[in-house]
């Protein structure tokens, strides 16, 4: 596939990169044909590549950059912290400051354990649930992505689905035999699996909005149903809010939908562009982590002062005005996608929750993983390439979602809508 934009330098770098990095990339979802563009710099809602191209960015590093790239307040705070040290191996006051802010925002959060990624957070939360309940089985929803660890890397979304590996080799059957898979938004399937595994299920883990298979919202009442059935059966409810945390609202999906989980995992936005994750939840559960309890979790860079500093500065700026503006922008683009698809008679379904959105080239409603998989992925990639040629970058996969930031202004939205029109017309 030849793109009608200059990418000579990116092509050179990709050929060199393949000699040293597996597949030429450090995460599979970053790869697209014929080769990805290589970024030289980023500012606000723009990426600038090695060939001098400018792209309006709706990927936002897969979610974290809600305040835009190279935010001056975050950069200044981090630069000041760097003069004080970049890793300590002992506690610092800023860890307390950020933990307090997380607890003030997330409804279920009574205590926090900082880690280094969303993957570490979900792995730790599942271990905690198993330790607390003394049960081994977990329920996971088909197509949900909860990180790249063995407990959950089965029938998963995100890059694994994009590149045809939803069930990764290298994971022993004994590891996943305790992972029970259920279609999202299906109440009867949940009831059936719980009834067949009485007093064996430690937790249900889910993305409240499935953001790693596009954007699939929960059906009305579905999260409340999960809350009730888990309480009735002594099962912990874990919200994986690595994507939705601090994006849907100050308190993430829990505040947005009015449902309080037992545990929640966050990341991405929490680090303001630096690596971080966190496990949060009720004190009675969280205190089972060592050193207070017997459930072990540790990490050299847990509570890293650079990441924590960036997180404090980020959350300071996420107020009601921020959520109102970013939600409005995503709504404008979602409406544009619907109207433009209809204008050109293209079967499409568009889903939007707060500042998250995605289009599926499909004529049926998308409520499960199987529905998402039935979408026309070839058409999506044609749409992706045309957007790219017209200066707009979205994630190169049907099974990721788009995000708006505070830096996507009216002029940027207008350019984006023009690009959407061109892309839809070509389809």
From Swiss-Prot:
EC number: 5.4.3.8
Coiled-coil blocks: none
Native organism taxonomy: Archaea, Methanobacteriati, Methanobacteriota, Methanomada group, Methanococci
GO CC terms of this entry: cytoplasm
Cofactor: pyridoxal 5'-phosphate
Annotated localization: Cytoplasm
GO molecular function, one term: glutamate-1-semialdehyde 2,1-aminomutase activity
Originating species: Methanococcus maripaludis (strain DSM 14266 / JCM 13030 / NBRC 101832 / S2 / LL)
Taxonomy, superkingdom: Archaea
UniProt cross-references to PROSITE patterns, sorted A to Z: AA_TRANSFER_CLASS_3
Pathway per the UniProt entry: Porphyrin-containing compound metabolism; protoporphyrin-IX biosynthesis; 5-aminolevulinate from L-glutamyl-tRNA(Glu): step 2/2
CDD domains tied to this protein: OAT_like
InterPro entries on file: 4pyrrol_synth_GluAld_NH2Trfase, Aminotrans_3, Aminotrans_3_PPA_site, PyrdxlP-dep_Trfase, PyrdxlP-dep_Trfase_major, PyrdxlP-dep_Trfase_small
Family in the record: Belongs to the class-III pyridoxal-phosphate-dependent aminotransferase family. HemL subfamily.
Annotated catalysed reactions: (S)-4-amino-5-oxopentanoate = 5-aminolevulinate
UniProt KW Kinase keyword: no
Official protein name in the record: Glutamate-1-semialdehyde 2,1-aminomutase
Cross-referenced SUPFAM superfamilies: PLP-dependent transferases (SSF53383)
A GO BP entry: protoporphyrinogen IX biosynthetic process
Positions bearing N6-(pyridoxal phosphate)lysine: 268
The entry's keywords: Cytoplasm, Isomerase, Porphyrin biosynthesis, Pyridoxal phosphate
């Amino acid at each position: 596939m030849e793109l009608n934009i200059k990418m000579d330098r990116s092509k050179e770098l990709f050929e060199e990169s393949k000699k040293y990095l597996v597949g030429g990339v450090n995460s599979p979802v970053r790869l697209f044909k014929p080769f990805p563009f290589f970024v030289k710099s980023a500012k606000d809602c723009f990426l600038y590549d090695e060939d001098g191209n400018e792209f309006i960015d709706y990927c936002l590093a897969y979610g974290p950059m809600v305040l835009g790239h190279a935010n001056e307040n975050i950069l200044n705070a981090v630069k000041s912290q760097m003069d004080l040290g970049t890793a300590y191996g002992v506690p610092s006051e800023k860890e307390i400051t950020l933990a307090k802010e997380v607890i003030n925002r997330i409804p279920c959060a009574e205590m926090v354990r900082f880690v280094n990624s969303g993957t570490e957070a979900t792995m730790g939360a599942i271990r905690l649930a198993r330790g607390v309940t003394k049960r081994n089985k977990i329920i996971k929803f088909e197509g949900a992505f909860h990180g790249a660890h063995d407990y959950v890397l089965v029938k998963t979304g995100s890059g694994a689905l994009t590149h045809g590996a939803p069930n990764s080799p290298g994971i022993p059957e004994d590891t996943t035999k305790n992972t029970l898979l259920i279609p999202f938004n299906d109440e009867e399937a949940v009831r059936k699996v719980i009834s067949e595994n009485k007093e064996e299920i430690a937790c249900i883990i889910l993305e409240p909005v499935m953001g790693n298979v596009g954007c699939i919202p929960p059906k009305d009442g579905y999260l409340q149903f999960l809350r009730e059935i888990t309480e009735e059966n002594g099962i912990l409810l874990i919200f994986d809010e690595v994507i939705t945390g601090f994006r849907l609202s100050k308190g993430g999906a829990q505040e947005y939908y009015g449902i309080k989980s037992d545990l929640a995992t966050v990341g991405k936005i929490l680090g303001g562009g630096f690596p971080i994750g966190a496990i949060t939840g009720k004190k009675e559960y969280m205190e089972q982590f060592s050193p207070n309890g017997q459930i072990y979790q540790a990490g050299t860079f847990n509570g890293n002062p650079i990441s924590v500093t960036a997180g404090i500065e980020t959350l300071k700026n996420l107020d009601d005005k921020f959520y109102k503006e970013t939600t409005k922008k995503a709504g404008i683009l979602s409406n544009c996608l619907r109207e433009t698809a209809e204008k050109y008679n293209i079967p499409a379904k568009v889903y939007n929750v707060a500042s998250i959105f995605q289009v599926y080239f499909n004529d049926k409603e998308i409520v499960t993983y199987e529905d998402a998989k039935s979408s026309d992925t070839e058409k999506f990639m044609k749409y992706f390439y045309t957007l790219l040629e017209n200066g707009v970058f979205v994630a190169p996969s049907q099974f990721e979602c788009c995000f708006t930031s505070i830096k996507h202004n009216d002029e940027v939205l207008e350019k984006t809508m023009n690009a959407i029109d061109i892309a839809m017309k070509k389809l």
